[in-house]
Structure formats: structure tokens, C-alpha cells
């Protein structure tokens, strides 16, 4: 991977760990949100000297630390019931934190403030630690947590740092070596949604000003990963599930995760933390009585330090049992590759011009506001530019668009060649339907809420006859809107045979 500085790193490669920011000796790097709401490094070229330190420290560019066990020991853990009640899973994080506090140490974890911003901070006692409990399904803003960790270590303090595997890798790269007083715990990670998506969800669903608390997970209605809870200032509660809550649905279906999450080298073995922690999903498949419905933590001891810490807290838990690693892997993500949702790009595009709720619904259902018919696929610049303008105008009106591909034709066709300029442009800037035969066009009624026929000679009989009567929208249901925009016959008269002209006139009445 060859980059001049960290600002040249592709978005598919950057984890957003911020190690580069605090490693730069000239303060030339800041983390800024992009259009999707994820944070990426931005380099001030006037301050940058090209020293290359940001490249050397980057967990994406550098090799993965392979020193931990490729097949770590796996454990199922229950904290005491009162701890599990207030935890997302088995309460092991609280057990660890109490151990560190008892040694005069500090805990670094993620909290959500009263503005529902999610970020890393430091807790020096159990009261400050309480907000760190519970899952937060948003990529946390690391702020200045790495320098703070370094500062506490410099004072001889024990530090417990929890974060996603890539964040742990970033911290270790920033520190530059093994720290005896540092205990790192990487979390089992499905992937990270953006701050922007969560903010839009909160504002649209509840109104931030009305909300008192939000919990990404709750056990009030059973132990699962798909139930969230919002508590309003007036005392009312909202419970959301995968069936109807847009954030839960989009997160579990990987609709709005960071691009790097799709191929994360830190999700696989060996892990980056001294310990790995998360829910032991699928534990019932191994041993049913290890799931009592109150939460079970999966803990991996990735090295000798992690194993020693786990041994030291055994007397502080209600139950701990060694399990086969295969049981841990079966229902959890322990691999680099993950299939992100095919509509991810479209979701973030829609987020710019419509509600988060609608963007999730239409992307999950494969629906569009408008299906655009016409000759956009023609091999000329004017045609593709005109249809691009039409689609952008509709998007500014808050409408999602689907370009309906060339109907009916089967066989060799240069307009279908992926190497021609119109196809290259379309693949980059449009969402294009699959090819439909003429007798299949009616299926588009299940996908598009309305239809538009675009400009150019779409009603020129010499052109349109190649597509049956599809450019007259013969396949569109009566109740759906049918609109023509700058459609043309190309001549001052129609060249259809009389019988076809009469039939066409009936179709025109439906517009």
C-alpha cells in the first residue's frame, strides 16, 4: 500500500482509529466526518512535512500483530445476577472494572451523553463507570483517549481499555510497545454504524429534546440482540424490535456500517486485545444450562496476561466454564469477510434527501419512488446527461429513482456493453434495474411507486417499437402515476399504423 501520507488512505482501508492524529509531531492531522457520518483523517498540507510517521503507525497500512494465540481459550461467564440485570450480556465488563478500580486503576470505555453522542472517556471510580455498561452500536468518537491512556500509564496507573479490535490495534500502535499496566479488551464486533445515522434516527423517531435515555439493548423483554428501548422525559417508553425499528433492522442487516467493516483483518484470529469480550450467542447449542436467559458473556484469553487476569477474577463471578472455541465461533463474527447489504451505497445517498426511516424501509424492501424509462442507455453523451439531470431533480424532491434497463432485447447489444461510456457512467451514478423481458415488465409494479418516461424520441415509432408498448407504460397498473417529461415523437406526425395509433391514444389517456 503506497500513500504519501494518511490523508491518501482509501475509505475502504481506514478504520478511523485516530492513532495517526496523536502520532503526528506537527499537529497536521484532524479527524472529520464525511458525508456518511464516519470520521476520517484530514491532513493540513501546510503543516505536513512528509515525515511518514502517520504511515508507520497506521493499523491499516502496517502488519497485523500476530503475537496473540491463534486459537485462544474460550470461556462462558456469568457475573452475579444483579450485575447481569444492568448489563447487555453476562456482566464480565463490570467484574473487570471493579478489579481495576480496586487496584487504583482507571477504565477507558464508551459512554453516551445527554445529547446522545457516543464517545470514549475515562472512569476513575464505579460511579463514573456505570454509563459505560451496555452495548453502543455506533462507532465511538475516540476524542483524546489515546493520549489520556498514555498519561495514566506514565503515572504508573493500571489502565483497562475496551474498544473494537481496530481501536485496540490503533491504541497499541500509538503506544508503540507492550505496557505492563495496560489491559486491553477487544469487543466482538458486528461492524460500526455512523454517528450521523444514529443522530438522524434519534431526531426522527423520538425528537432528541423529548428523550431521557436510550438503550441499544434491553433485557426487559427477554435476552436477545434485537430489542432497543427509549425512555422519554414524560416517563413513557418505546420498545423497538427488528420487525419495525429502522435502526435495529438496518444494523442487524449491515445496511449502514463503515466500509472497512466488510473486510476487517482485526475481526479474525489472533485477536488484538489481551482479552476478547462479548455475548456468547449460540451457547445453548453447546450447553443449554449456560443460558438462563439473563445473559452470558463470551471471554477469550488471547495471551498469558489475559489468562492471568481471568484467573484473578474467577472468585468474583457467579459461574465460569471453559468451552470449545468452536462453540464461540459458531454464532459470532470471527473472520475478516462480512457481507454488507447490497443497498448500502443507496442508503447513504437517500439519507441526503429523505428520512432515515424511509431510506431503511425502501432499501430493505428494494423499493423506489420512481422508475425512469427511456433511452438513457443510448451511447451518446446528451442522452445520459439529460437523464442524469432528471434523476437529480427527482432526488431534490425527496424521491428515490430506479433507472429501468433496456426492455425486452436479448442478445448482443453494444448499449449493454459494460465498457461503453454510458454504462460506466450509469454504474457510477444510477441505480439500475435488472433486465426485464417485455412480458416481465409488470413485475416493476412491485418495486416502483410511480413511473416517468424521460426525454428524447421515446415515442418515435421507429425507436419505440423495439420495446413493445413499454414506453407507453402498458405494463403499469392503473392506480400508479405515469408521467412524461420532455418526451418526443421526433417528427410533426406519428408514423404508427392506424390501429396502433388508436391503441397508443388509449395509453396516453392514462398519463
Regions found by a protein language model. Give the residues of each.
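Short, flexible loop segments at boundaries between secondary-structure elements
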Residues: 183-204, 478, 484, 488
